[in-house]
Amino acid sequence: MKIFISIILLAIGVYFIQPIWSEFLSVPGTFRGDGSERIVVFTADDCGVNCRDAINYLNRSGHAFEELVLDNNEQNLKLFQQLGGSDVVPYLSSGYQLVSGFYPQDYLSVLAAARGLAILDPAMKKVYTQHFDANKNSLLVMYGTSWCVDCAALREYCSVRKIQILDWDIELDADAAARYEMLGGRSYPLVFYGARRMTSFSPEALRRLMKI
């Protein structure tokens, strides 16, 4: 059973929903008043090229977002920490998605989740459609290997809880390997639930990814 605690921070206009499940307490997420995902990116004056590239990328996307600078701003720093931030900027939150650092393909996943697959070019749209069923419902998919420890942990977690997952071994499946490269995979497992992306496994991260 889900209990929702809503926190409205009027000073910056961000709507946070913090879910409490019986098994764990999640970090908050960033949402609009209507429940849609809201993109917030934290930066710092000394961040340099990574923060500039992140902001430029989001500006070019045309999608609304908020930049919150951490320098000399206790409120922004507190939010940053509440959302799981530590020592890496830029740090992006969109709904329950979190991205540490700037990786274009991670940001593209955030935008696709927020705006739909129509924003993708034909090649990337073809990749992302593999993460949905024929009725356009999100599928849980994993790009992994047979030897990856976290991949095995995710398989076991899903098996015990009867969570359906498409398990692609990129060392055996050439098509999956090609998609993994196009998606900018950097480690294993690379997990998607529809357009939403997860780059490492933990039970909390999976629940946040699937909003369950």
Which residues are covered by each model-predicted region?
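Thioredoxin-like thiol-disulfide oxidoreductase module
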Residues: 68-87, 168-187, 210-212
